Amino acid sequence: EAVGMSSQSDIRAGYLPLLIGTKYNHNLDENINVPAGLTPIPGAMALGATWNTNLALSMGEIAGAELSELGVNLYVGPSLDVADSRSGAGSGGAGLGAFGGNPYWVGEMIRSFIVGVHRGSSGRIAFVGDSFPGLGSADSGSGIDAPVINKPLEELVESDLNPYRIVTKSSYGSEERIDVLMP
């Protein structure tokens, strides 16, 4: 059962809600202007630099409440990428769109942000991660050419997949459940 989206009986009866999604990340994506009336939120790297999961939770609550008011029930983003210092911002790496370069803290910050989105929307918003494991260290952006991730599998599993593992855990604390759709 998706949290707050519909009941099990509705799904069995063939009813699924229309998903209205957005990739709009408030100010988490520096390439998107914040529409009038919505609260500007620090960029992902700035928020991640605080290492403050309570702040990420609060920012998620703001995003969840405002997007829910607009009728959005599918949140695409923020990026689950881990910034890699070996790939510059111009190459295709995550750059400022990532919460940081430490896989553990990236996962914890994103997880807190998602819990905040769920709380702020009263469980009415599902989440889809805005990336694919390893793109934070790719040699080119996916819009330019097929990205190549020059890492051994072991390193990819240790670093880039860690935020996905953290976010897809079954619960946060004892009362929250996180719904995540993987690309």
What does each of the following model-derived ranges do?
Residues 1-183:
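Glycoside hydrolase catalytic-domain context in secreted enzymes
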